[in-house]
């Protein structure tokens, strides 16, 4: 009887050990499959990006030269691991360049720096009509696919530095244009953007005021503490990911503060226009009002408008309705005051014709 019990006990241990080993292998296989799926998603994004690049040429072929160049920005803000021997290598990223086809030799043209929106996104033909509006007035446009952008594979995606060195990438694109295109007027450079691009506009005009004539920030991400507190907890995962900050805002509040435009409100020294919308379901109006109130608290002079339940929510002045394009016209008029473009729009009808051809 004793031998039987001993045998049963040994069998139980063996089965348990086998089950644990089986569970361990299963977890490894699940992790491997998950990574393969994520890699396929990045491959899909790369294909979509190549198609969209073709669309850029098609949508602007009548008025602009479209180019895409590769630049280098600062190294990652932190090494991927302690044994990364290439941690100090500058990061490579792509940048779009749009130049009016009717530029004249020997003349100077104003430059618009236009960073794209999205925590992980890219400069897509979503902005085609806006770029057409700018080109039609004689602006040169540059748009950086800063670190963290989609369409360039997993490495670029995981190089994200939200509110950090992505701003330097955008500055690199600005400097590239001034250094390499003699047609660009270094005295007439503005930065504009929406949502996350609006955040980058704020960060650059506040931290590097001498590099820009003016700025527009549409529905800009402005305060990470407010944003994380008011959004779904899953949003936090973008920041706590090991390849990004790797800590929550409770663990390192100063790290999140340095990535928030509201922390630099006291530095404003250039003309600025801010737009927000009360029914914005992404960058809530309360977050933008924090930025506006911070600027007011420091007695800064700037322009802003709070739109009341404008159709389109977060994208209210980027969609194609007449209401939306009429609002964009006011943005162009703000830029015109400081940038003196060669061919400013006389009215909203001229602007719509430039963007939509009719």
Predicted feature locations:
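Sec-dependent signal peptide recognition
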Residues: 2-7
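Extracellular/periplasmic ectodomains of large secreted or surface enzymes and adhesion receptors
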Residues: 54-87, 97, 336-358
């Amino acid at each position: 009887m004793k031998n039987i019990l001993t045998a049963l006990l040994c069998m139980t241990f063996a089965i348990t050990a086998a089950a644990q080993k089986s569970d361990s292998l299963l977890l490894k296989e699940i992790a491997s499959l998950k990574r393969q799926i994520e890699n396929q998603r990045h491959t899909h994004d790369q294909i979509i990006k190549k198609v969209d690049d073709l669309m850029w040429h098609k949508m602007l072929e009548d008025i602009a030269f479209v180019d895409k160049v590769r630049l280098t920005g600062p190294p990652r803000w932190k090494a991927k691991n302690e044994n990364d021997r290439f941690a100090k290598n500058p990061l490579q990223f792509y940048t779009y360049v749009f130049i009016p086809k009717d530029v004249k030799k020997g003349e100077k043209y104003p430059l618009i720096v236009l960073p794209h929106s999205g925590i992980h996104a890219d400069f897509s033909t979503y902005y085609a009509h806006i770029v057409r509006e700018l080109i039609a007035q004689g602006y040169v446009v540059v748009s950086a696919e800063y670190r963290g952008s989609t369409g360039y594979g997993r490495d670029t995606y995981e190089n994200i530095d939200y509110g950090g060195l992505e701003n330097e990438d955008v500055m690199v694109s600005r400097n590239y244009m001034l250094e390499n295109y003699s047609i660009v007027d270094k005295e007439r450079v503005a930065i504009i953007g929406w949502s996350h691009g609006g955040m980058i506009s704020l960060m650059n005009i506040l931290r590097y005021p001498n590099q820009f004539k003016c700025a527009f920030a549409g529905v800009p991400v402005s305060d990470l503490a407010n944003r994380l507190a008011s959004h779904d907890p899953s949003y936090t995962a973008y920041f706590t990911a090991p390849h990004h900050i790797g800590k929550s805002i409770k663990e390192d509040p100063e790290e999140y503060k340095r990535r928030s435009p509201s922390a630099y409100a006291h530095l404003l020294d250039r003309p600025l226009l801010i737009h927000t919308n009360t029914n914005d379901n992404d960058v809530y109006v309360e977050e933008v009002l924090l930025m506006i109130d911070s600027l007011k608290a420091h007695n800064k002079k700037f322009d802003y408008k709070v739109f009341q339940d404008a159709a389109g929510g977060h994208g209210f002045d980027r969609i194609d309705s007449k209401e939306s394009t009429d609002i964009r016209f006011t943005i162009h008029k703000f830029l015109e005051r400081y940038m003196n473009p060669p061919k400013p729009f006389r009215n909203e009808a001229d602007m719509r014709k430039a963007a939509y051809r009719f």
